[in-house]
Amino acid sequence: MIPGEYQIQDGDIELNAGRRTLTLCVANSGDRPIQVGSHYHFFETNDALTFDRAASRGMRLNIPAGTAVRFEPGQSREVELVELAGERRVFGFAGRVMGAL
């Protein structure tokens, strides 16, 4: 191995394999852009985002780690959410859960 060398396997990497997903239509009803990161509990996003909030409980955006989705004012788009994994306990964010899902 050479320092800094990449050793990449053939094929594709499937993110979040085997986890339940949900597609929702989300609209930004506010007057400012809203950006949501890859691991933010979608249920607790900015109230200016309108969508089926109850359905999003325990889910996050199904996008690569470290990335985000930006919603411009008045913009509406479909997003895919994926279930949170691990112990399924949520703390922080907007403080709407603060415990087990």
UniProtKB/Swiss-Prot annotation:
Query: Which Gene Ontology terms cover its molecular function?
Result: urease activity
Q: In which pathway does it act?
A: Nitrogen metabolism; urea degradation; CO(2) and NH(3) from urea (urease route): step 1/1
Record-given protein name: Urease subunit beta
Might you give the EC number(s) for this enzyme?
3.5.1.5
**One GO process term, biological-process aspect:** urea catabolic process
Q: Which PANTHER family match?
A: UREASE
Native source species:
Stutzerimonas stutzeri (strain A1501)
Known catalysed reaction(s)?
A: urea + 2 H2O + H(+) = hydrogencarbonate + 2 NH4(+)
User: Mind naming one GO cellular-component term on file for this protein?
Assistant: urease complex
Cell compartment(s), UniProt:
Cytoplasm
Question: Which Pfam families would you find in this protein's record?
Answer: Urease_beta
Top EC class for this record: hydrolase
Name the domain of life: Bacteria
- Outline the subunit composition: Heterotrimer of UreA (gamma), UreB (beta) and UreC (alpha) subunits. Three heterotrimers associate to form the active enzyme.
Q: Which UniProt keywords apply?
A: Cytoplasm, Hydrolase
Q: Can you tell me which family this protein belongs to?
A: Belongs to the urease beta subunit family.
